[in-house]
C-alpha cells in the first residue's frame, strides 16, 4: 500500500513543516 505511505510522506502537516 504505497498510497498510505505516500499520503504520510507527502503530508507537510505531519512533518511539521507547515
UniProtKB/Swiss-Prot annotation:
<keyword id="KW-0027">Amidation</keyword>
<comment type="similarity">
    <text>Belongs to the arthropod PDH family.</text>
</comment>
<comment type="function">
    <text>Causes the migration of the distal retinal pigment into the proximal end of the pigment chromatophore cells and thus decreases the amount of light entering the retinulas. May also function as a neurotransmitter and/or neuromodulator.</text>
</comment>
<dbReference type="GO" id="GO:0005179">
    <property type="term" value="F:hormone activity"/>
</dbReference>
<keyword id="KW-0964">Secreted</keyword>
<dbReference type="GO" id="GO:0045202">
    <property type="term" value="C:synapse"/>
</dbReference>
<keyword id="KW-0527">Neuropeptide</keyword>
<keyword id="KW-0529">Neurotransmitter</keyword>
<protein>
    <recommendedName>
        <fullName>Pigment-dispersing hormone C</fullName>
    </recommendedName>
</protein>
<feature type="modified residue" description="Valine amide">
    <location>
        <position position="18"/>
    </location>
</feature>
<dbReference type="GO" id="GO:0007268">
    <property type="term" value="P:chemical synaptic transmission"/>
</dbReference>
<dbReference type="GO" id="GO:0005576">
    <property type="term" value="C:extracellular region"/>
</dbReference>
<keyword id="KW-0372">Hormone</keyword>
<dbReference type="GO" id="GO:0007218">
    <property type="term" value="P:neuropeptide signaling pathway"/>
</dbReference>
